[in-house]
Amino acid sequence: MKTVIVPAPGKIEIRQVGTPVINAYQALVKTEMVALCNATDSKLIAGKFPGVDTYPLALGHENAGIVVAVGEKVRNFKVGDRAIGGLISDFGAQGVDSGWGGFSEYVVVNDFEVLK
């Protein structure tokens, strides 16, 4: 899948990474909409987000999409639901450090952290 990566402060690229794999308590959401967050994304790109100094990292935490797969213990969502997510606990792309990743074709969301 494609995702937006900041390989180093001041640089942005679209990178091909593996589609994330969900666990029993997660859902896979196909991204349909994203929004740029000036308070977060612009600071991450500039290398000025407090406490973040490890690159490359994935951008985006304001995203919405459609649930395409659910883990066997997910109770709050089913395939076909529309969902919005917040921060992603584990982006899941090798070599990319981030708690974000909303600017990806697919995101993993935890059952207890997502709204529909």
Regions found by a protein language model. Name each.
Residues 1-2, 15, 81, 105:
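Extracytoplasmic/periplasmic beta-strand context in beta-sandwich domains
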Residues 4-12:
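Extracellular beta-rich ligand/substrate-recognition surface
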Residues 14-16, 64-66, 106-108:
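Conserved hydrophobic/aromatic beta-strand scaffold that supports enzyme active sites
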Residues 20-36, 48-92, 99-101:
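Glycine-rich beta-strand-centered segment in the early N-terminal region that forms part
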Residues 38-45:
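Cytochrome P450 core scaffold surrounding the K-helix E-X-X-R motif
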Residues 89-116:
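NAD(P)H dinucleotide-binding glycine-rich loop of Rossmann-like/cofactor-binding domains
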